[in-house]
Swiss-Prot record:
It is found in: Cytoplasm. HAMAP family: Arg_succ_lyase (MF_00006). This is Argininosuccinate lyase. Pathway: Amino-acid biosynthesis; L-arginine biosynthesis; L-arginine from L-ornithine and carbamoyl phosphate: step 3/3. Pfam families: ASL_C2, Lyase_1. It catalyses: 2-(N(omega)-L-arginino)succinate = fumarate + L-arginine. Transmembrane segments: none annotated. GO terms for biological process: arginine biosynthetic process via ornithine; L-arginine biosynthetic process. SUPFAM superfamilies: L-aspartase-like (SSF48557). The keyword Lyase applies. It is an enzyme of class 4 (lyase). The lineage of its organism: Bacteria, Pseudomonadati, Pseudomonadota, Alphaproteobacteria, Rhodobacterales.
Length: 471
């Protein structure tokens, strides 16, 4: 009787040669990643087909074996996409599940596929391909939301509303200018995803476990086949690098922050106390007890869900911060964070695009709010500087005194009489009242990047051209 262990009872037929027994059930549960990394099936099969083609081109595989592998992998792909593929936990991950099924389909040639390859570089290329695709999806989602904000900006280029600091009225601005602020934020988000995509577009396949391989492989061939610009230059870095995932999460977190900020504004603006916007029935819900309620649940949920994206970034940074080179099993914890962040961000982008596209601004409420709260006080101070040659600090003091008087009277600055103003400074003239109107205030803000309606229209046209939407 042989003392050799039965391969069927070993830990895993793919790596169990030195093991006499299989893992504990709890170890198997900890170790298995198929429950989440099966999402990489398309990338895994694509990478394997490119690897097999390269091995054949280099004479490492026969053309017959390479053809059988390629066709077998397409069969596996079809089975998975049909929804009936029997993923097996004991095979741990997507790589082993695909290879095991390939062996069932084509037999011995399947065992040759892993020549000059390790799961370390295999998962690195699979994951990089997936994240690269997700960068493209995020860019498309961001551009759709930018267009929704641009439509609002064009429609409301001259609608006056209050600009806020500390959530208190500061100065009049235009609705269009406020919408364009989010276009600018989203443009930076788009740029971050584009930058991250460009940086991650190097192929780690061929780094093998960590040291490269002695087989005469052509890494440039596989890199080109998979749409990468070049192969990675250091095999140690190739298998240990998760910067691409961290960059994706960082860009996602900043984008999520922007979505959450506008979601917060929608919650505030749609309240009865503000009445700045009306959200459509598509993005609101009612109450089971209060018939009058129309709750901004989509905005509230989006505001909360975006926190998950920030949490995912922190989680992966925490996983990676203490790892020596090269691969450690800790790195298996990278995918769930990225998958959840990507799903959450894409859902948030789609929901926000719908809400922005449907929302209706209440011009009357916006204008009324803009005209209250002494919003043109800065215009008055500027007038004192321009017309009376006061130092700005003196003009600031005079204006503050007038605000205090108006507040004591229970009125706004335009409601003070000329005589009351002249009691504070005798040089004030009748023409001061022209700068105290909110419409004149926003029209005067013509500096580059300012809120003047003509500026808003010009910026909206510029962004439409940059997005390829110009007429």
């Amino acid at each position: 009787m042989s003392d050799a262990p039965d391969p069927s009872s070993a830990a895993n037929a793919m790596w169990g040669g030195r093991f006499a027994a299989g893992p504990d059930a709890i170890m198997q549960a900890i170790n298995a990643s198929i429950g989440f990394d099966k999402r990489l099936y398309a990338q895994d099969i694509r990478g394997s087909r490119a690897h097999a083609a390269m091995l054949a081109a280099q004479g490492i595989l026969t053309s017959r074996d390479a053809e059988a592998i390629g066709e077998g992998l397409l069969t596996v792909l079809s089975e998975i996409e049909a929804g009936g593929f029997p993923f097996r936990v004991e095979l741990e991950d997507i790589h082993m599940n695909v290879e095991a099924r390939l062996k069932e389909l084509i037999g011995e040639p399947a065992g040759r596929l892993h020549t000059a390859r390790s799961r370390n570089d295999q998962v690195a290329v699979d994951f990089r391909l997936w994240v690269r695709d997700q960068c493209d999806a995020a860019i498309s989602g961001i551009e759709a939301l930018m267009r929704a904000f641009l439509a609002q900006a064009e429609a409301g280029a001259d609608w006056v509303m209050p600009g806020f600091t500390h959530l208190q009225t500061a100065q009049p601005v235009t609705w269009g200018h406020h919408m364009l602020a989010y276009v600018e934020m989203l443009a930076r988000d788009r740029s971050r995803f584009k930058d991250a995509r460009a940086r991650m577009n190097e192929c780690p396949l061929g780094a093998a476990a960590l040291a490269g391989t002695g087989f005469p492989i052509d890494r440039h061939m596989t890199a080109a086949a998979l749409g990468f610009d070049r192969p990675t230059a250091n095999s140690l870095d190739s298998v240990s690098d998760r910067d691409f995932a961290l960059e994706f999460l960082s860009a996602s977190a900043i984008c999520a922050l922007h979505l959450s900020r506008f979601a917060e504004e929608l919650v505030i603006w749609s309240s009865a106390q503000f009445r700045f916007v009306r959200l459509s029935d598509r993005w609101t819900t009612g109450s089971s007890i209060m018939p009058q309620k129309k709750n901004p649940d989509a905005a509230e949920l989006l505001r909360a869900k975006m926190g998950r994206v920030l949490g995912a970034a922190v989680a992966l940074f925490t996983v990676m911060k203490g790892l020596p080179l090269t691969y450690s099993k800790d790195m298996q914890e990278d995918k769930e964070q990225v998958f959840d962040a990507a799903d959450t961000l894409m859902l948030g982008l789609a929901a926000m695009t719908g809400m922005v596209g449907d929302m209706q601004a209440n011009r009357e409420s916006l204008a009324a709010a803009a005209a209250s709260g002494f919003s043109t006080a800065t215009d008055l101070a500027d007038w004192l500087v321009r017309e009376l040659n006061l130092p700005f600090r003196d003009a600031h003091h005079v204006t503050g005194t007038l605000v205090a008087r108006a507040e004591a009277r229970g009125c706004d600055l335009p409601d003070l009489s000329l005589a009351e103003m002249q009691e504070v400074h005798p040089g004030i003239r009748e023409d001061v009242f022209a700068v105290l109107g909110v419409e004149n205030s926003v029209r005067s803000r013509t500096s580059y990047g300012g809120t003047a309606p003509d500026n808003v229209r010009a910026q909206a046209a510029r962004w439409k051209e940059l997005l390829g939407d110009a007429a």
